[in-house]
Amino acid sequence: MIQNESRLKVADNSGARELLVIRVLGGSKRKTGNIGDIVVCTVKQATPGGVVKKGDVVKAVIVRTKSGARREDGSYIKFDENAGVIINADKSPRGTRIFGPVARELRENDFMKIVSLAPEVL
């Protein structure tokens, strides 16, 4: 569960390394987000020469969380870190590569480009 002020690692090669969550999108009372949710973030750390710079406000989709996501069959999936992928307005990733595994729930939320670029879908 990701909330305001949560820090996310970046799982793509857009140039950002760490994000700070400003807002979880999806309603005025929405407090937390899980895998597949879109969040508004600011870039806290960035690599030199990247597409995004430190201080940029971007939208990202959550691809991994430490707190588990419950699936329809009753199983849970948990990861070792909280991570996100920076996206454009049309839900396509800003980077050209995705690092690390992503959850199968992204396929249900129409993030097919991220799923196809990911090395492993759990």
From Swiss-Prot:
| Keyword RNA-binding assigned | yes
Signal peptide residues are none
Single Gene Ontology MF annotation? structural constituent of ribosome
Any one Gene Ontology cellular component term annotated for this protein: cytosolic large ribosomal subunit
| This protein's UniProt keywords | Ribonucleoprotein, Ribosomal protein, RNA-binding, rRNA-binding
**InterPro entries named in the record:** Ribosomal_uL14, Ribosomal_uL14_bac-type, Ribosomal_uL14_CS, Ribosomal_uL14_sf
Q: Which CDD domains match?
A: Ribosomal_uL14 (cd00337)
| Listed GO biological process terms | translation
- Transcription recorded as keyword: no
| Subunit organization | Part of the 50S ribosomal subunit. Forms a cluster with proteins L3 and L19. In the 70S ribosome, L14 and L19 interact and together make contacts with the 16S rRNA in bridges B5 and B8.
The task this protein performs is described as: Binds to 23S rRNA. Forms part of two intersubunit bridges in the 70S ribosome.
Q: Which NCBIfam families match?
A: rplN_bact
Q: What is this protein called?
A: Large ribosomal subunit protein uL14
Source organism: Lactobacillus acidophilus (strain ATCC 700396 / NCK56 / N2 / NCFM)
